[in-house]
Amino acid sequence: MPDLSFLLYALAAVAGCLALPVLAWYVVTALWGLAPLRGGVGRPTEKRLRFAVIVCARHEEAVIGQLLDSLKAQDYPQDSYQMFVIADNCTKDDTAGAARAHGATVYERHDEKKVGKGYALEWALARIREDYPDRFDAVCVFDADNLAAPDFLSRMNEALQNGADVAEGYRETINPGETWVSGCYALYWMFLMRFFYRARRNLGMSCMVCGTGFAFKMEVLGPEGWHTRTVTEDCEFSIQQITAGRTIAFVSEAVFYDEQPRDFATSLHQRFRWLVGAAQATYWCMKTVIRGIRAGHRGSVDMLGFVLAGPAAVLLLLQGCFFWRRRCCGPRRRSQFCAG
């Protein structure tokens, strides 16, 4: 009969061999975030893309007006963009009325079975393409609690006109000093912007969109439109685009401001949703990533690292727990640490 200890050590070693390459990939690429920022959004252009600016909102009556006012204050020609608010299952307040009062075109959606931003975007984009055929060249997506810098659309226009298919802006935090939770979020986004987004821009690689403050050419949707299945629709959309050979540019010059959770319970709920979404992405998107690698799209290798990051973290955690238990509960110390 095989020695059980040997089998456990072998499994732990295999777990480490599988997980460490993913960790090493992220560490090596992150180092490029320390380098000076390379490249720009592209040359200024007189041509103006026509943007459909979409805001998915649920019970956001209190904050939606501030975002819409910041969008109306853009230095972009007013006739080259239109604001759309998707009042998604808003049963507790008048989000739709507040949005109309601030000049937005409002679509009200009521579907308690398909709840989530991905479903709302799929529904809204289908409606907009039907109601405004061939009117818009690009789409820009915001959350209701955001604010946009005055030149946000101008910077996105430059990026999309100079080779990018999708563009992600630079996220700043509105309320970094409000609570310790919002302060931790501010640090999280600051590190992510530098060591993930900036690093990939310096390496000439595509980044990923992060839920809000991003834009894309209408043509990337194709005839099927927006279609995502996970609760992290931004990650799934990014994987779809990169594995198809398209470019997602990090436009650090396009700044937007995002309000962060104030309390730990809200943060925990959000993190759990992200965790579920990462697991879904690993399950649903692995075939897409493999197809992208076989097609020779180099960004697909980075996406492979992304979909494997969650399983790799779990493997490293289990490996650490195993070796900790072996150290603490070995034959000489079992009576001390493992009594009962």
Predicted regions and their residues:
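N-terminal membrane-anchoring/stem segments of glycan-assembly enzymes
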Residues: 1-47
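Long helical/loop segments within the catalytic core of UDP-sugar-dependent glycosyltransferases
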Residues: 30, 108-110, 114-132, 151-230, ...
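Membrane-embedded multi-pass helical conduit in multi-pass membrane proteins
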Residues: 32, 43-45, 305-340
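Cell-envelope/extracellular polymer assembly enzymes that use nucleotide-activated donors
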Residues: 49-52, 82, 236
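Acidic helix N-cap motif at the loop->helix transition within catalytic regions
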Residues: 65, 91-100, 150-151
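Short, acidic, metal-binding catalytic loop of nucleotide-sugar glycosyltransferases
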Residues: 69-80
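A conserved acidic beta->alpha catalytic loop
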Residues: 87-96, 111-113, 147
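Acidic donor-binding/catalytic loop of UDP-sugar-dependent glycosyltransferases
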Residues: 93-94, 142-159
